[in-house]
């Protein structure tokens, strides 16, 4: 029995939901999110509330029950508030700037790194903080992870790109012989 799947999802004002075959479509104006129910989760639309239940008693259906509910909830939050991740750049000469739809990073390599910003994502840079915003939680996390992967923080001085709330475990350097 899924504890997450049992909980209903409230639709905020301005959102509309509809079913097309095995797909749940949540819409706000021109922006829409499509969630595939894989045919094993039944979605009930009652006014401004979505409820979910498995169609069959298989292990896969029970697993997808909570997953589909969580994806629908993330779609509602994404369309109303949006998601954001903040990254911090630490290091001498490390910097970032946005040029059109390209994020240009200088991270101590012999060349700048040009990262193309995907559709649906906005990136802003203030001093050494990169903010990644969007309505799709998975895409925001993926883009932030890709930016971090260009120069992960190293454990000795903490130089690199890290999440703002991430704690880097520091190591002591080598000690000199007597």
Swiss-Prot record:
Keywords for the protein's UniProt record, in alphabetical order: Ribonucleoprotein, Ribosomal protein, RNA-binding, rRNA-binding
Protein family according to the UniProt entry: Belongs to the universal ribosomal protein uL6 family.
Coiled-coil segments on the chain, per record: none
A GO CC annotation given for this chain: cytosolic large ribosomal subunit
Subunit-level organization: Part of the 50S ribosomal subunit.
Name of the featured protein: Large ribosomal subunit protein uL6
NCBIfam families: L6_bact (TIGR03654)
Organism expressing this protein natively: Nautilia profundicola (strain ATCC BAA-1463 / DSM 18972 / AmH)
Highest taxon, organism lineage: Bacteria
GO molecular function per UniProt: rRNA binding; structural constituent of ribosome
Described function: This protein binds to the 23S rRNA, and is important in its secondary structure. It is located near the subunit interface in the base of the L7/L12 stalk, and near the tRNA binding site of the peptidyltransferase center.
HAMAP family in the record: Ribosomal_uL6_B (MF_01365_B)
Biological process according to GO: cytoplasmic translation
Taxonomic placement: Bacteria, Pseudomonadati, Campylobacterota, Epsilonproteobacteria, Nautiliales
């Amino acid at each position: 029995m899924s504890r997450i799947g049992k909980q209903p999802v409230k639709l905020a004002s301005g959102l509309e939901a509809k079913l097309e075959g095995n797909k749940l479509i949540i819409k706000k104006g021109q922006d829409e999110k499509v969630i595939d129910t894989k045919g094993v989760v039944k979605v009930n639309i009652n006014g401004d509330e979505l409820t979910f239940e498995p169609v069959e008693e298989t292990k896969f259906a029970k697993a997808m029950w909570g997953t589909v509910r969580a994806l629908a909830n993330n779609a509602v939050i994404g369309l109303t508030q949006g998601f954001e991740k903040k990254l911090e750049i630490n290091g001498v000469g490390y910097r970032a700037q946005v040029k059109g739809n390209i994020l240009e990073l200088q991270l101590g390599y012999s060349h700048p790194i040009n990262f193309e910003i995907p559709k649906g994502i906005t990136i802003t840079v203030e001093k050494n903080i990169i903010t990644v915003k969007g309505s799709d939680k998975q895409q925001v996390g993926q883009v932030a992870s890709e930016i971090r992967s260009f120069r992960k923080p190293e454990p000795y001085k903490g130089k690199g790109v890290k999440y703002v709330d991430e704690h880097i475990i520091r190591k002591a350097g080598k000690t000199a012989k007597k």
